[in-house]
Amino acid sequence: MRVQMFSGKETGEFIGGKTSLQTEAYENGLKDEELYYNIKDDLGLISRGNVYLDKTAQTIFSELSIAIDKGNLEPLKNFLKNNKLQHKKADINAKNGYGDTPLCYAAEKNNFEVAKILIKYGADLTIHNAKGETPIELFSQYGNREAVNYLQHCLDILGNNSLYEDTI
């Protein structure tokens, strides 16, 4: 099921680097904070599982990126939990228009709490962004030792840590 707005555009469509939801809000003169507060109720519907989004990269990423940008973990947790419980196939490793997965995006924002949630729900730690950087490399650039150690531990468990020997 795809969610459509009044304009007929689908929420996951990308137009000029923004989702159609963001584009429509900006066309109507809304700023970032206003956009967030105007759609937070919609995010609540999505996170409660009343609205099911299709699995396009743009849709999953746009919903996750709002939670990442605002640091509000509850909509993100609820979205991922309901996606898993409802056996939906939204791709947690989908890339946005800039080549970032949600985990890479969280690492670029140095948001370790969001990264832990994404990893819990199956985010792949080995996927590179468009610049060829992995989440562990991105956290390392910020000097976020706690995040780097956590990701290394996860990679050790998965048996993939040899990919990251020279990142710190």
Swiss-Prot record:
The keyword Kinase does not apply. ANK repeats lie at residues 59-88, 98-127, 131-160. InterPro entries: Ankyrin_rpt, Ankyrin_rpt-contain_sf. The keyword GTP-binding does not apply. Keywords: ANK repeat, Repeat. This is Putative ankyrin repeat protein RBE_1411. The lineage of its organism: Bacteria, Pseudomonadati, Pseudomonadota, Alphaproteobacteria, Rickettsiales.
